[in-house]
Curated annotation (Swiss-Prot):
Keywords: Metal-binding, Nickel, Zinc
GO aspect biological process, one term: protein maturation
One GO MF term attached to the UniProt entry: zinc ion binding
Keyword Zinc in annotation: yes
Residues bound to Zn(2+): C70, C73, C86, C89
Name of the protein described by the UniProt record: Hydrogenase maturation factor HypA
Keyword Transmembrane helix: no
Residue numbers binding Ni(2+): H2
Function recorded in the entry: Involved in the maturation of [NiFe] hydrogenases. Required for nickel insertion into the metal center of the hydrogenase.
PANTHER family from the UniProt entry: HYDROGENASE MATURATION FACTOR HYPA
Native source species: Rippkaea orientalis (strain PCC 8801 / RF-1) (Cyanothece sp. (strain PCC 8801))
Superkingdom field: Bacteria
Recorded family membership: Belongs to the HypA/HybF family.
UniProt xrefs under Pfam families: HypA
Length: 114
């Protein structure tokens, strides 16, 4: 389960950017073709946040659909796995153009009133 290590890295990056300020929410974008299971990230998140500025933060995951473009005819198609066949010409020469993402889209920190 490589998602544990990925989650730990996400938390480390967000904690570093938060500079000690408690984090309320983290939003990730995870592509369906990224080989990262969003449910596993959700499972690991609360456990990995314990004792950090992210403890108690909510996690939002936006799943990005897979899309490919045929290198032969230019047709764009939906992909549900990292390979496929062009709907128009039958070619297997597809370029993945969307769905391999893993991004920290945003984080929300607590306001500090001085």
């Amino acid at each position: 389960m490589h998602e544990l290590g990925i989650t730990q890295n996400i938390i480390a990056i967000v904690a570093e950017q938060a500079k000690g300020i408690p984090v309320k929410r983290v939003t990730l974008e995870i592509g369906q073709l990224s080989a990262i299971m969003a449910d596993s990230i959700r499972f690991c998140f609360d456990i990995c946040c314990q004792g950090t500025v992210l403890e108690g933060a909510t996690l939002e995951i936006i799943e990005i659909l897979g899309r490919g473009k045929c290198r032969d005819c230019g047709q764009e198609i939906a992909l549900f796995q990292p390979f496929g066949t062009c709907d128009r010409c039958g070619s297997i020469q597809l370029e993945i153009i969307q769905g391999q993402e893993l991004k920290i889209k945003e984080m929300e920190i607590e306001e500090i009133c001085v």
